[in-house]
């Protein structure tokens, strides 16, 4: 490639072509900036592993939203804070989070999934990588994400908007867990895909006694997988396609944790977390209804207990006040009435 007068000359073998200035820019072209460094001696002080960042991108990009009416969820969130660079993506049904070591300041930016296409492959060929944030334009809250390699600089202006509070969506309490090989689990799920005869196929998972049992609804097929298990025996239903995608992204040994049959499930592997919503079944709906009623009764009972405690406290306070009042009355000595002084009756005086 060689830049000429407002043109870019591209030569590949015997073929030569020219690209005029702004010729490749269309209505849907994202407003990004890409600088090509021509100096082979350009030095980049790395602050993150290029391969590590490439793997992180490949783990979050599949879970961004594809619908144009949700532009914020079409982005990957980059957030640097407390010595970590966290990448977050979500599509409304799944949430992916991965944190990398990063000790070079703080900042955050929302970058469109379309802008990040091909970046992971470019990073795999790069020897050094550096991630930084800078203020964009005159805006006080505008931020740009910059990725430098020894050859190319990428600069993306953050999309305007607020990302959902994803931390609240990651479950922290669980009633059952399993630790197993993701590759073997993918093979087990694929063996159940054939009997389903459908692109969208649900898979029921139950684990306990050192095994994970995967089955099609209506007992069309079943597969077992050795695993380290613990907790209660709970059955949860997941979309088969989502399950395979989650297992492939996790890779290696994976931890799978669930709370009940209707709450979000959690896949985790080496600092990577993937939250997936289960599919609702009649059993899950009944359990959710029963749990809601139980919580309502518990809340009502706690409210009654609290009201009774407050009433009891008021009663005791009133009784104590009465007792203290009686004691104060008894301590006061009665004052004796002073005897009244008799008045002398004046005698009549005779007048001569």
Predicted regions and their residues:
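Structural preference for solvent-exposed beta-strand-turn elements
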Residues: 1-352
